[in-house]
Amino acid sequence: MIKLENDWDELLKDEFNQPYYLKLRQFLKNEYQTKRIFPDMYDIFNALKHTAYKDVKVVILGQDPYHGPGQAHGLSFSVQKGVQIPPSLQNIYLELHNDLNCEIPNNGYLIPWADQGVLLLNTVLTVRAGQANSHRGQGWELLTNRIIEMINQKEEPVVFLLWGNNAKEKLQLLTNPKHIAFTSVHPSPLSASRGFMGCKHFSKTNHFLEQNGIKPIDWQIPSI
């Protein structure tokens, strides 16, 4: 039984008993037993564990987890302490520096964002080592779409940051006029220069939150 230790438990309990999820669970059980899978089994739902539904102010959507050793720990774009900062996150930090004058930290551990209400959600929550997108189409997308739909139903305004075509596909799930979505190309080095750099999404997010009487995010990740 999955225990998230916050309000997500009640919200998702029916979802975890749906046929698609039970099938996904069986697939994962076999994958974890026979192959190297990231993140660690106990880290899969860290995004939900660190950011309760009631606390969600911002959603940053990723695709699937990092597939290198020691990187993924259940939050989009974040890596574990002591691991080299991946290129996409380097570009996120560069944009934060240019946008809000944040100092570029020496780590990619984004838990301080999650603890302030930034849900760092990948649309697929597991991956085989070294094989990007290897767990696509197994059922994760149904669950994460449901999570996005639930956040869409929130009364309190939420900012959605949708970077790249995969994330932008989720715009169709966002029907609540109280929320706002900012879109751009992905921060990957392959595309960042075509519109991510200079997007100012972080200052725009805080401006929107403040306009709605919500405490803004302190985007500065401390160096360790």
Swiss-Prot record:
It is an enzyme of class 3 (hydrolase). GO terms for biological process: base-excision repair, AP site formation via deaminated base removal. Disulfide bonds: none annotated. GO terms for molecular function: uracil DNA N-glycosylase activity. Its EC number is 3.2.2.27. It catalyses: Hydrolyzes single-stranded DNA or mismatched double-stranded DNA and polynucleotides, releasing free uracil. SUPFAM superfamilies: Uracil-DNA glycosylase-like. Keywords: Cytoplasm, DNA damage, DNA repair, Hydrolase. InterPro entries: UDG_fam1 (IPR002043), Ura-DNA_Glyclase_AS (IPR018085), Uracil-DNA_glycosylase-like (IPR005122), Uracil-DNA_glycosylase-like_sf (IPR036895). PROSITE patterns: U_DNA_GLYCOSYLASE. The active site is at residue 64. It is found in: Cytoplasm. One of its GO terms (cellular component) is cytoplasm. Belongs to the uracil-DNA glycosylase (UDG) superfamily. UNG family. NCBIfam families: PRK05254.1-1 (NF003588), PRK05254.1-2 (NF003589), PRK05254.1-4 (NF003591), PRK05254.1-5 (NF003592), ung (TIGR00628). Excises uracil residues from the DNA which can arise as a result of misincorporation of dUMP residues by DNA polymerase or due to deamination of cytosine. This is Uracil-DNA glycosylase 2. The lineage of its organism: Bacteria, Bacillati, Bacillota, Bacilli, Bacillales.
